């Protein structure tokens, strides 16, 4: 039986923390940034954690 592969899109978008939580980046910080407030852009810069309701789905994609 062949090895199960990690989802290519998921491995580019998510990262694990030392405690096993899953980090993600915020959306809406790619283009048309002149229309967005400085406060909003600063808030979107920082990484966030994946919500617990989505965690199991992401773990399946990452094969954790």
UniProtKB/Swiss-Prot annotation:
- The highest taxon in the source lineage is Bacteria
Alphabetized SUPFAM superfamilies for the sequence: L35p-like
Q: Which InterPro entries match?
A: Ribosomal_bL35, Ribosomal_bL35-like, Ribosomal_bL35_CS, Ribosomal_bL35_sf
Entry-linked Pfam families:
Ribosomal_L35p (PF01632)
Question: Cellular component GO terms, alphabetically?
Answer: cytosolic large ribosomal subunit
Ordered alphabetically, the record's keywords are: Ribonucleoprotein, Ribosomal protein
Q: Name one GO molecular function term.
A: structural constituent of ribosome
Q: Which cysteines are joined by disulfide bonds?
A: none
For this entry, list what GO says about its biological process.
translation
- Provide the family line: Belongs to the bacterial ribosomal protein bL35 family.
Kindly give the PANTHER family that the UniProt entry links to this protein: 54S RIBOSOMAL PROTEIN BL35M, LARGE RIBOSOMAL SUBUNIT PROTEIN BL35M
What name does UniProt use for this protein?
A: Large ribosomal subunit protein bL35
Q: Which organism is it from?
A: Amoebophilus asiaticus (strain 5a2)
């Amino acid at each position: 039986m062949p090895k199960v592969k990690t989802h290519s899109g998921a491995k580019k978008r998510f990262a694990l923390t030392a405690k096993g939580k899953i980090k993600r980046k915020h959306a809406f910080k790619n283009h048309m940034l002149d229309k967005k407030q400085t406060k909003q852009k600063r808030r979107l810069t920082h990484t966030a954690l994946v919500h617990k309701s989505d965690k199991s789905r992401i773990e399946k994609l990452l094969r954790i």
